[in-house]
Amino acid sequence: MSARWTTAVLDPQMTGGLAVARSPEGFLVDANGALFPRDWLKRQDLDVLCEHGIGHFDGQPVFLLELRSATDVPGCSWRGLRAFMLEGDFDTYKVLGYAAQIGTWAREHRFCGSCGQAMTQIRWERAMYCQPCDLRSYPRISPSMIVLVTRGDEILLARSPRFVTGVYSTLAGFAEPGESAEDCLVREVREEVAVEVRNIQYVGSQCWPFPHSMMLGFHAEYAGGEIVMQPDEIEDAKWFSVHDLPPLPAGRSIARYLIDLYVARRLGCDIPAFPS
């Protein structure tokens, strides 16, 4: 959360404020960005699936218009969420990241997972409700760990087949039922590269709205084993010197922060700011 942006449950029946429009193609933008006067946005010919009040930005209420499909709006275009993460105002990215998570949840929870009937939006909390089942569905958050494995002046980096060509990153994976974050870390490192770790140190967390992860970041020391890459998950993995690193993840990601923080400490450089 930032001083400019705070989340809140707002009643869509209230008037005024700002709004963002999200479709399967991304967020609607114009020359001024992705936040529009709400009254103007609702006058456009948009295929609205639902509307949610999501918080306040610079003191103004903000609403999400979740759309069934993209619509041409004069002077506007559609832009994916990752583009906002990589460049531009990080506070706006936080608004849109939250909006994307709420939009995904609202789209996926229109019907009860137990009986199949339509669910209704609760006005006073972030939940969808099935009256026959007395069942509430809340926005999904998927906890996952992300870890930089270290060995003195070397760090273990890997690349997935899904990565941008040449980029290496830290190891990561989702927590399983019954696991602590530390249990998940040990298992995922063992599964992905077949090495063991020790001295696990928590560093920080980051919301990762692609679509609904909570990344718990760690440093861990190498304890033994030879790298054996997990088929289909890891395309390459190797040890890199802190003096000679490959192309790395985006600067606003916790993956990049874990790397930059360790390198700064080893080289005696200034500690980087956390991407919060």
From Swiss-Prot:
Cross-referenced InterPro entries: NAD-cap_RNA_hydrolase_NudC, NADH_PPase-like_N, NudC-like_C, NUDIX_hydrolase-like_dom_sf, NUDIX_hydrolase_dom, RNA_Hydrolase_NudC, Znr_NADH_PPase
Record's keyword terms, sorted: Hydrolase, Magnesium, Manganese, Metal-binding, NAD, Zinc
Record keyword Translocase present: no
Residue numbers covered by motif Nudix box: 173-194
Binding of substrate, residues: R82, E125, Y138, Q206, C207, W208, P209, F210, P211, H212, S213, A255
Sequence positions that bind a divalent metal cation 2: E188
Residue ranges constituting the Nudix hydrolase domain according to the UniProt record: 139-262
Binding locations of a divalent metal cation 1: A172, E192, E233
Cofactor: Mg(2+); Mn(2+); Zn(2+)
PROSITE patterns listed in its UniProt record: NUDIX (PS51462)
E.C. number: 3.6.1.-, 3.6.1.22
PANTHER family, per database record: NAD-CAPPED RNA HYDROLASE NUDT12 (PTHR42904:SF6), NUDIX HYDROLASE, NUDC SUBFAMILY (PTHR42904)
HAMAP family membership: Nudix_NudC
Similarity-based family: Belongs to the Nudix hydrolase family. NudC subfamily.
Protein name as annotated: NAD-capped RNA hydrolase NudC
